[in-house]
Amino acid sequence: MVYAIIVAAGEGKRAGFEIPKQFVKLNNKTILRMSAEKFQNSASIDKFLVVSHRNYVDLTEKEVKIFSKFENVVIGGSNRQESVYNALMYLGKKENKPDFVCIHDAVRPFVDTNKIDESIYKAKEIGGAVLAEMAENTISQVNNGRIVKTLERSQIYLHHTPQTFDFNKLLKAYQKAEKILSSFTDDASIFIHAGYETAIVEDYKNNIKLTKKEDFELAKCIFELNS
């Protein structure tokens, strides 16, 4: 069984909207609903959870309860890592635990359903898989505003979501890193820290994360191109 965890627990202050950015609409549909729809349509996903800020549980449920694969809203923590951990612990208490879990940022509404399926297929083969975009620009390592060295860009990938993992291994990885969760920037880094192998699945560039207000202007362009 494969569960998706859609992380929608942020308040989205950087985006400058009056409401959290996952509830901002593109063409009369919220970002959250757009993302949830992708997992509803994936043949590889059996069920999904949504992690929500405690102040927006009702609004979150209203947006996703229309989907047959939706199971529950889990209250998030003080940061993304704690929010995912809460969802993993919820799943860990179930009698029928998932075999794999697919974790996605709600504010990446343009993820391709085929890429979701591809990441799950690769995770079943390796143990973990991350959608990622190969770097095209020159990448430098910097110290105090000065370039230390130029990195080999053919070996650099920019992580996206979803990120898919063997559920038991990911839960163990989170438990192992419980006291230092805030030092990690994504689920793959926690999984790798525990010593587990993780593969890259090359992703499309338009699977952008909507973080700032200008990202939403780009999102409108992507939406129009895809329509």
UniProtKB/Swiss-Prot annotation:
GO molecular function: 2-C-methyl-D-erythritol 4-phosphate cytidylyltransferase activity
Presence of keyword Zinc-finger: no
Residues with site note (Positions MEP for the nucleophilic attack): R153, K209
Pfam families: IspD
Family the entry assigns: Belongs to the IspD/TarI cytidylyltransferase family. IspD subfamily.
NCBIfam families membership: ispD
Entry protein name: 2-C-methyl-D-erythritol 4-phosphate cytidylyltransferase
Organism of this sequence: Petrotoga mobilis (strain DSM 10674 / SJ95)
Organism taxonomic ancestry: Bacteria, Thermotogati, Thermotogota, Thermotogae, Petrotogales
Gene: ispD
